[in-house]
């Protein structure tokens, strides 16, 4: 009986903490994504990616 109550409480904690953690991570991720895809950074990232690809192809 005590095990069942503990299990229920544990599930409730996970259920409660899960969405808020996911929401926090997605919020942080989307703000980072929008920061990186804003115009100057997009150019910088694309140019650095192209440069590294070019260097790997030359090596």
Curated annotation (Swiss-Prot):
Compartmental location: Mitochondrion inner membrane
Recorded superkingdom: Eukaryota
Reaction(s) the record says it catalyses: a ubiquinone + NADH + 5 H(+)(in) = a ubiquinol + NAD(+) + 4 H(+)(out)
EC number(s) reported in the record: 7.1.1.2
Major localization class: mitochondrion
GO molecular-function terms, A-Z: NADH dehydrogenase (ubiquinone) activity
Transmembrane segments: 32-54
Record carries keyword Transcription: no
GO CC entries: mitochondrial inner membrane
Membrane-topology descriptor: Multi-pass membrane protein
Disulfide bonds: none
Keywords assigned: Electron transport, Membrane, Mitochondrion, Mitochondrion inner membrane, NAD, Respiratory chain, Translocase, Transmembrane, Transmembrane helix, Transport, Ubiquinone
Family membership noted in the UniProt record: Belongs to the complex I subunit 5 family.
Protein's job: Core subunit of the mitochondrial membrane respiratory chain NADH dehydrogenase (Complex I) that is believed to belong to the minimal assembly required for catalysis. Complex I functions in the transfer of electrons from NADH to the respiratory chain. The immediate electron acceptor for the enzyme is believed to be ubiquinone.
Protein name in UniProt: NADH-ubiquinone oxidoreductase chain 5
Organism per entry: Artemia salina (Brine shrimp)
Gene that encodes the chain: ND5
């Amino acid at each position: 009986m005590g095990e069942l109550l503990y299990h229920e409480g544990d599930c409730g904690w996970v259920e409660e903490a899960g969405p808020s953690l996911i929401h926090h991570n997605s919020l942080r991720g989307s703000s980072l994504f929008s920061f990186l895809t804003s115009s100057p950074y997009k150019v910088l990232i694309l140019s650095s990616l192209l440069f590294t690809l070019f260097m790997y192809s030359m090596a």
